[in-house]
Amino acid sequence: MAIRIVGVDLPQNKRGFIALTYIYGIGRSSAITILDKAGVDRDIKVKDWSDDQAAAIRDVIGAGYKVEGDLRSEVQLNIKRLMDIGCYRGIRHRIGLPLRGQSTKNNARTRKGKKKTVANKKKATK
């Protein structure tokens, strides 16, 4: 039986705190905290969870964590807000350059995308 939490099917053969990291917005440390609050041993595999344990985990996540779609939309709204107010980070988001001071002369290919070739300038004849 697959256990589904906030729209994500958790892998059955992984330990609980690793399986919870498949949910967007939950890392290892927050997964351990969630399992401790729910009273579930973190080393039990997901397939061995009872329905009560899964329900307790759902309750803890629902009460105290913003995950999946809500978190994704909040991040997108934060980026949109930066672009709307026209701050430095917003401008860099808009033109697709690194935000945090990295050099862009030679690198930053991940952020800038595939290389665009520019035609060579004609050399002045002597």
UniProtKB/Swiss-Prot annotation:
Pfam families: Ribosomal_S13 (PF00416). Residues 108-126 have a biased composition (Basic residues). The keyword NAD does not apply. InterPro entries: Rbsml_uS13_C (IPR027437), Ribosomal_uS13 (IPR001892), Ribosomal_uS13-like_H2TH (IPR010979), Ribosomal_uS13_bac-type (IPR019980), Ribosomal_uS13_CS (IPR018269). The keyword Coiled coil does not apply. Keywords: Ribonucleoprotein, Ribosomal protein, RNA-binding, rRNA-binding, tRNA-binding. PROSITE patterns: RIBOSOMAL_S13_1 (PS00646), RIBOSOMAL_S13_2 (PS50159). Part of the 30S ribosomal subunit. Forms a loose heterodimer with protein S19. Forms two bridges to the 50S subunit in the 70S ribosome. Located at the top of the head of the 30S subunit, it contacts several helices of the 16S rRNA. In the 70S ribosome it contacts the 23S rRNA (bridge B1a) and protein L5 of the 50S subunit (bridge B1b), connecting the 2 subunits; these bridges are implicated in subunit movement. Contacts the tRNAs in the A and P-sites. NCBIfam families: uS13_bact. This is Small ribosomal subunit protein uS13. It comes from Porphyromonas gingivalis (strain ATCC BAA-308 / W83).
